Amino acid sequence: MPEIGVRNGAFGADKFGLQNLKAVYWNPGAPQLYEHALRSGEAMVNADGALCAETGIFTGRSPKDKFTVRDAATDKSVWWAGNQSMTPDQFAALYSDFLAHARNMTLFAQDLYGGADPNFRIKTRVFTELAWHSLFIRTLLRRPETSELAAFVPELTVIDLPSFRADPQRHGVRSENVVAIDFTRRIILIGGSHYAGEMKKSIFTTLNYYLPDQDVLPMHCSANVGPGGDSAIFFGLSGTGKTTLSADPGRTLIGDDEHGWSKDGIFNFEGGCYAKCIRLSREAEPEIYAASKRFGAVLENVVHDEVTRVPDFNDGSKTENTRSAYPLEFIPNASLTGCAGQPKNLVMLAADAFGVLPPIARLTPAQAMYHFLSGYTAKVAGTERDLGNEPQPEFSACFGSPFLPRHPGVYGNMLRALIAKHNVDCWLVNTGWTGGKYGTGRRMPIKVTRALLGAALDGSLRGVPFHDDRYFGFAVPTSVPGVEPHILDPIRTWADKIEFDRTARALIGMFRQNFTKFENDVDAEVREAAPGTMMAAE
């Protein structure tokens, strides 16, 4: 079979059982992949030069269709309460059927790195059925120099075949769609879905499994670094402002989504960004807007004018989860090394729709571990389907529960130790509501959030007075230059103090109920960091 492109000839497609293929294109760049995608009709080019594709019925990840092989090695190491298992025999049958399905196909192969730090990166080979998927993953991971490809030996292999259909009875899965990960054999199989994000997040899941054994904490976070080399980490679930707040013109962006924290500092796992682009505008997010409107960007499910091919980022008729993938170098102030020193600040973002968390609070290491394991934000009507008028809490362990192969306590203990070792200042920032909950209060002004965050990152908050929040126990500043004092204490912003008390106590109960599953895995200091502990002692 023809194999075209620069590669390690000793580790070709046949090494992975991929035989009788029509052709394999090795490490093609964007121009070649555009040509293949257009020739096959799998994508189109818009008026800005971006490559645009639709993903059909799957416009997001399908976590219920993700499975991990349970064998002698993973039986004790994987967190089975949060991961679905399949047997080695079921995976073997699935792998065999993948290889059979690939016969007579043209595949695209990319040799890439998962991780910017040469000491901890994982050499990753990705075979894709679709050219636009190949461009996507080439954009999202880190690309080796051409001179490195001839000796590239993969440590992780991904086979991505959207046209494959799984057999639930034969393969032990839920539907025809499947993501199967074998940590022992270091293979990922993805079938049935055209949604390219499945590749990105399944590779992230494997990094979350392998890196703790090398004393590296994998994190679902964004990160940036100041002019003085002071790096900062931003945790937060969707809608909390993680991407927006880490994109600070006065600081260099390290990455927007996945990072590792090692003895040497922090590093990006990726070489690109995967931004939500629903209602994207030049005014609100100029850098992401510009990056999404040029050759080399990949747009998923973005609606275009049929004649002019001009994108309409405001149109969510296909999905609210429209996406733009682009190389990190498309962002003017991005770090191309993807590495920085030890962080000085760690920020946990929560869009508290109950309106009872302060706009900023300082956390002890034990409180930081508690809130890291909790991973709190809140959903409201208008941003999620099937929600009523009341906010709904969302707790996702380590701010990334779907991607945790190990018990959350593994990552929590690593975080706590790193915070203590490097004397990191930890902050909880509420980007949600103030003056009342969703429906009666107002969204926290972004100007206030930026001012408080700036004061935290530049060290200004170290010189201001703090008081202990009666409800949640963390330290809250009583005055910050440039910020109205009353907004710092949430109860002062509510007209109805009795309703504030009721709402705060209700949220405390939600935190405590969620944390019951971790109580036996943490020490007394972390348990006592729970919201409401001070009130109980009164």
UniProtKB/Swiss-Prot annotation:
Signal peptide: none annotated. It holds the Pfam family PEPCK_ATP. Its main location: cytoplasm. It catalyses: oxaloacetate + ATP = phosphoenolpyruvate + ADP + CO2. Keywords: ATP-binding, Cytoplasm, Decarboxylase, Gluconeogenesis, Lyase, Manganese, Metal-binding, Nucleotide-binding. Mn(2+) binds at K201, H220, D257. Its EC number is 4.1.1.49. Its cofactor is Mn(2+). The keyword Ribonucleoprotein does not apply. Transmembrane segments: none annotated. GO terms for biological process: gluconeogenesis. It is found in: Cytoplasm. PANTHER family: PHOSPHOENOLPYRUVATE CARBOXYKINASE (ATP), PHOSPHOENOLPYRUVATE CARBOXYKINASE ATP. Involved in the gluconeogenesis. Catalyzes the conversion of oxaloacetate (OAA) to phosphoenolpyruvate (PEP) through direct phosphoryl transfer between the nucleoside triphosphate and OAA. Belongs to the phosphoenolpyruvate carboxykinase (ATP) family. This is Phosphoenolpyruvate carboxykinase (ATP). The lineage of its organism: Bacteria, Pseudomonadati, Pseudomonadota, Alphaproteobacteria, Hyphomicrobiales.
